[in-house]
Amino acid sequence: VVTSVPVLAADTVVQAGETVSGGTLTNHDNQIVLGTANGMTISTGLEYGPDNEANTGGQWIQNGGIANNTTVTGGGLQRVNAGGSVSDTVISAGGGQSLQGQAVNTTLNGGEQWVHEGGIATGTVINEKGWQAIKSGAVATDTVVNTGAEGGPDAENGDTGQTVYGDAVRTTINKNGRQIVAAEGTANTTVVYAGGDQTVHGHALDTTLNGGYQYVHNGGTASGTVVNSDGWQIVKNGGVAGNTTVN
């Protein structure tokens, strides 16, 4: 786990107690935030690819640091270390946020959010071709998923929508949205609307299907699912469903 970054001569450091506003990071620039950074645009940091520990550029939010209203464009990286917090980040396609601290109200417009062990993401909105990956030991709450199911029912498209290896709580899945709950993952209190679906290889608790679909695969368990009008629960060979209510 990376908790610090070497301070090079070309780096910009926002010291504790200091507030900066505006600016753009390009061409391997670093901004190391111990204070508060508002309204930054980040266009560098992913030179070695998504979620790669070798990446060194971009914006680094350290313990006690805060970043608000950040824009992350293609190739840009916002890294939030343990004890750091960010809010209202917008991430375009090709950009990413690596999260070990806290993030509130992130919008993924084709971008990616990787929530690592100890990280907490609240209120993320995942739009077309965006992806939220919740790793083991991480938590995402109140996520809205608007992408992932464009390939059709029960077609796992890879890195779009929401993939849960840790814990997802109170996720809303809208039309074209998909939540994939991996074998080690748990999804609690998910609501799935028409045109969206939940694919379960791990554990799904108290899912409500308001016209949406739930696929429980081999090894997956679904408990307390409520199937409302036009909803559909499909329990495959080796899958388990208990305490289902069909309306």
Task: Give, region by region, the residue ranges found by the protein language model.
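Gram-negative bacterial Sec-dependent N-terminal signal peptides
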Residues: 1-6
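The right-handed parallel beta-helix/beta-solenoid scaffold, focusing on the short coil/turn
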Residues: 10, 16-23, 28-30, 35-40, ...
